[in-house]
Amino acid sequence: MIVLVTCLLLLCSYHTVLSTTNNECIQVNVTQLAGNENLIRDFLFSNFKEEGSVVVGGYYPTEVWYNCSRTARTTAFQYFNNIHAFYFVMEAMENSTGNARGKPLLFHVHGEPVSVIISAYRDDVQQRPLLKHGLVCITKNRHINYEQFTSNQWNSTCTGADRKIPFSVIPTDNGTKIYGLEWNDDFVTAYISGRSYHLNINTNWFNNVTLLYSRSSTATWEYSAAYAYQGVSNFTYYKLNNTNGLKTYELCEDYEHCTGYATNVFAPTSGGYIPDGFSFNNWFLLTNSSTFVSGRFVTNQPLLINCLWPVPSFGVAAQEFCFEGAQFSQCNGVSLNNTVDVIRFNLNFTADVQSGMGATVFSLNTTGGVILEISCYSDTVSESSSYSYGEIPFGITDGPRYCYVLYNGTALKYLGTLPPSVKEIAISKWGHFYINGYNFFSTFPIGCISFNLTTGVSGAFWTIAYTSYTEALVQVENTAIKNVTYCNSHINNIKCSQLTANLNNGFYPVASSEVGFVNKSVVLLPSFFTYTAVNITIDLGMKLSGYGQPIASTLSNITLPMQDNNTDVYCIRSNQFSVYVHSTCKSSLWDNIFNQDCTDVLEATAVIKTGTCPFSFDKLNNYLTFNKFCLSLSPVGANCKFDVAARTRTNEQVVRSLYVIYEEGDNIVGVPSDNSGLHDLSVLHLDSCTDYNIYGRTGVGIIRRTNSTLLSGLYYTSLSGDLLGFKNVSDGVIYSVTPCDVSAQAAVIDGAIVGAMTSINSELLGLTHWTTTPNFYYYSIYNYTSERTRGTAIDSNDVDCEPVITYSNIGVCKNGALVFINVTHSDGDVQPISTGNVTIPTNFTISVQVEYMQVYTTPVSIDCARYVCNGNPRCNKLLTQYVSACQTIEQALAMGARLENMEVDSMLFVSENALKLASVEAFNSTENLDPIYKEWPSIGGSWLGGLKDILPSHNSKRKYGSAIEDLLFDKVVTSGLGTVDEDYKRCTGGYDIADLVCAQYYNGIMVLPGVANADKMTMYTASLAGGITLGALGGGAVAIPFAVAVQARLNYVALQTDVLNKNQQILANAFNQAIGNITQAFGKVNDAIHQTSQGLATVAKALAKVQDVVNTQGQALSHLTVQLQNNFQAISSSISDIYNRLDELSADAQVDRLITGRLTALNAFVSQTLTRQAEVRASRQLAKDKVNECVRSQSQRFGFCGNGTHLFSLANAAPNGMIFFHTVLLPTAYETVTAWSGICASDGDRTFGLVVKDVQLTLFRNLDDKFYLTPRTMYQPRVATSSDFVQIEGCDVLFVNATVIDLPSIIPDYIDINQTVQDILENYRPNWTVPEFTLDIFNATYLNLTGEIDDLEFRSEKLHNTTVELAILIDNINNTLVNLEWLNRIETYVKWPWYVWLLIGLVVVFCIPLLLFCCFSTGCCGCIGCLGSCCHSICSRRQFENYEPIEKVHVH
């Protein structure tokens, strides 16, 4: 029956309802609804599933439930104040036919800076189908639009993927589950879907809640609603009991008792583990040395609970607790039958002294039946002290208490002062007595403990825990245990190795597992063995001191076997030996005569301690080898000594020394037993983890038989000194030695292991499904069972999921599936950004410069524990004392790799078309060309590979003469004068007789062709002969034709010589000009080859940088590996060898040196790696800038894209980065000008300035006092125009005088780097120095480009030498300039014949008188005319009037 109350006065006073009407909130009794009877019980037992009784406390839903809903379709708000938890029940009052489905309920728990929102739905809601109808959202937003949040704004409101927790709301939960949120200063607990989630949220809670609710359902009864809820402000306790499946609970009302019970009592879970959430009140970390104050570390502690006995109070009667045969009849919860190592008494006293007076508080029944009593006194006691007032007060003491160990009422040893407050006493079966975690006293092993006690206060509370040692991650605060994580599972082992109880999503190295007890394998050389048993007898002398304490006498005797009548020195003369110690104990009362047996407190045994030797005495029989080994009672010639001590029930006392003389070697072996004779004492345990000693090399590993054959060597080690294999000399079989544990990386998501990467194909971490990748095997919870994936390399398309964690290019999804994520595909063809013609100035040269930029580094994961300890369990325990050293190293590398992976993934993408052009064959194909280039046969043939096309073709056409003509005729080639020969041939018509008739004239000189055939020669010879013969008779004229012809031909030759001289001059001038051009051309070739040489040198430098980048990491890893050979001042670099030679305590000290040294080496490596990653991060950003500015566009910055004016750049992939080919213009000539920043002009009273508008132009003043503008990129001066300037107000230049302190106010981002570094060095100057390790060769793949770089440098040098040779050749060419010795031109004037001169004389005689007569006789001015005129004028003066007037006549 539902109780309906409509009055708002029933609402609790701790909350206030706003924006509601009086009928919208009612009080309901949820537990009375059908099916809700066990609502509270199920909620309380949701986190307590074990057998037993506990008291739990918290802000539980024990207050009034309310339901607020409205009939209107709009939503309303209600506010709760001063509460610490808020709970609600879904559809507690709705039947299955109601329509409240889809109606949201949302409440907001306010805090600063983080708050929490929980929203819930009945069915799938629009845009939230994947959230399973409910969501816990952690947000930093203070102001939330609740209306939008309920629909589609949740994704931007919740901060991060790990800040959203979806949960399920199903119809079967109809009112049967409580949902809610409880918060405090430490953590937040979310109760959803029958589970509780502990969220570590650091915030300041305001303890108020805003509730949003909507309209009610349309059920048949009134006021039915979809939700009931309550806010809780009171802390309550419940006592829960689970016995044989019967669960009962009751409200615990005795606050003091309930508080003590809840704080100190718990029910161990299955396996004896302390449950999560236990407060560990007054539980301390047990230690035999210094006490940890605070921290988190892995340790071996008695925290495995065999039985927990809650004891409200003790009676007066004594209680006895035994380690063996303990009866666990009163255990709370589960009980185990494990061996009890430590009994822990946890004391819950707060104020008064609780111990009863006069009681012997603790009695320890040690071996041999001797009972030691421990008691404390308020002052010092004497030998005859009465122990009637001795006590150990529990709780806070009222003064100092001095504690002693007593035997039969006599104080044997003073222990020390009791702590002011005793909270816990723990006693181990090995005789250790701890108070508040500190080892207060140690004695012989203990069988039982007894004491009597009266609590005295009703509120006192005890728990007695029978515990066993187990490995756990313990968090200590103020010396008290606060939290424990057991290293009992695969995921917990990783938590322990990472020193954290909460693992973030990521990859973690798998922790080494404990090897435990394994078989012993020994490999020795076959030999004939002789054996010696060395029996050492030690006779101890014991007596009591004046205070009754046992004292070992220095007169104790050591007896060695007699050898050569000498008992002071004994040397091993066989090749095998065993050492045995026999101890006797005699006592004396007062004198030094020891003739009585040692009993009771005088009982003592002799032990031989390590002393100064690099090996322990008890390890001598553990196959230690020597070349020489002697024991001596005298220090003379000794190398080291053992300390011989007497061990009593209270202490150890050194009485003598046993000296050792030894030499290292393999001739003598210490063995456990006699094996004399001819034997091969080798014992092998194959294919299983074994503790081995192979030819003196010790360790733990798996020995396997191999098929290898090696001719030399007995055993084979790595660079780090680890044993890799060995040879059995009897049969030559090679065996390999591998570690028992192989390093692996586990993928952890949401606190669970979902996968693991390993180098061997073997199941691990409980993972059975596997697949392979090119580099490792991957085991996962994902079911790789199909034929397509199991055992084969995976593909990124095999699994369709979103990776949660990534490492390099590997991603792991939440279901454990492995995907590769580093390839991002882009669509579209490869197209040029722009095209155009570039005009290169004559004072520039084109250069291609190569630049390499590193983009990423290969991620490195180091298993710190494996590197430092190599799986040695004792070393691993020592390593935990270094707290978070390994975790810091591994997380630094992992976080660096993840950050780099994210940046590289966001930077790089892959284009399919670009990949097609990556090969030469595809690049030289027209299939990938734009259509405008289709006419070319190939890209390479047209542009890049076309040298063959510009060479002469082998089938080019040439013209040749007729071979028949050359064979049948003699060819005479002469030089002719102009057209003389052609005109001569045309005139003669082939007749020799016409030779003189057809003589030609060249420049007025008669000439004949110089060649005469046989007929002409016969004709002229006959003429000459006839002339000679008939000369006397007057017939010499017959020789005239011959003379004329000869003279004409001589004229021809003379004129021909003149023409040849002119031609030679023309040829010489042309040749000299050609030689000048050749010299200039060779000079340009020389410059080109010089540029090519520089280009090759640049490429060589870039390749050297690539090689350095690739090899740097390998060299660093090599450096790290080599450090494993360094013993760091320990006796050996092998941890197994150290523990094999020394006792545990001495070995720990030696191994601690190795741990410190190796951690230092790891820190140096990590620092180097992180520094390198920081450099690469900057280089990656610079490469991105260069791609954007150089490749995708043209840079305007000089020197950014190559050292010059940038034209274009090409980028190509290179190992770990990119290589850029920058095409730039390099200036070859410079013009120096004086640049002006502006012009200051005056106009009367006004002064103004003019500055150049375009900052890429430079204003300068030339020698002619004129101003010019020129671009900065090339000298092209031009006259400035008014449009090139902009006017400014004035010409004043403002200078700011500021100090370094004032610079940040002027330049906000200014940082004084030098001062910052100096401050860091001063404030954080370390008091130690990191050793400088040398780099050695590491067994890794190196990028060896040395040969290629040397070849490039050789070619560059060869080209340089070629330029030198060309310079010499140019000088030689200049020396071949033609300087011809010109032929003298002789000009001969031919005299005219006599008859010519006769004719000239006759003409002069007859013509000159006639001309003179005409000149003097004619005209008005003639002589005759003048005489006639004179005569006439005398006769008559008017004669001239008879003449007609003269008129001017123009003749055209």
From Swiss-Prot:
UniProt organism field: Feline coronavirus (strain FIPV WSU-79/1146) (FCoV)
Role noted for this protein: S1 region attaches the virion to the cell membrane by interacting with host ANPEP/aminopeptidase N, initiating the infection. Binding to the receptor probably induces conformational changes in the S glycoprotein unmasking the fusion peptide of S2 region and activating membranes fusion. S2 region belongs to the class I viral fusion protein. Under the current model, the protein has at least 3 conformational states: pre-fusion native state, pre-hairpin intermediate state, and post-fusion hairpin state.
Signal sequence bounds: 1-32
InterPro entries, per database record: ALPHA_CORONA_SPIKE, CoV_S1_C, S2_sf_CoV, Spike_S1_CoV, Spike_S2_CoV, Spike_S2_CoV_C, Spike_S2_CoV_HR1, Spike_S2_CoV_HR2
Region entry Heptad repeat 2 (HR2), spans: 1308-1405
SUPFAM superfamilies according to UniProt: Coronavirus S2 glycoprotein
SUBUNIT field: Homotrimer. During virus morphogenesis, found in a complex with M and HE proteins. Interacts with host ANPEP.
Membrane topology reported for the UniProt record: Single-pass type I membrane protein
GO BP field: endocytosis involved in viral entry into host cell; fusion of virus membrane with host endosome membrane; fusion of virus membrane with host plasma membrane; receptor-mediated virion attachment to host cell
The family this protein is said to belong to: Belongs to the alphacoronaviruses spike protein family.
Matching PROSITE patterns: COV_S2_HR1 (PS51923), COV_S2_HR2 (PS51924)
Intravirion side: 1414-1452
Localization in the cell: Virion membrane; Host endoplasmic reticulum-Golgi intermediate compartment membrane
Region Fusion peptide, annotated ranges: 1025-1046
Entry keywords, A to Z: Coiled coil, Glycoprotein, Host membrane, Host-virus interaction, Membrane, Signal, Transmembrane, Transmembrane helix, Viral attachment to host cell, Viral envelope protein, Virion, Virulence, Virus entry into host cell
Gene3D superfamilies: 1.20.5.300, 2.60.40.3130
Region feature (Interaction with host ANPEP): 660-804
The protein's name: Spike glycoprotein
Keyword Cell wall biogenesis/degradation among UniProt keywords: no
Region (Heptad repeat 1 (HR1)): 1040-1159
Membrane-spanning segments: 1394-1413
Coiled coil segments of this chain: 1107-1151, 1341-1383
Segments on the Virion surface face: 33-1393
Domain notes: The KxHxx motif seems to function as an ER retrieval signal.
Domain of life: Viruses
S2: annotated span: 780-1452
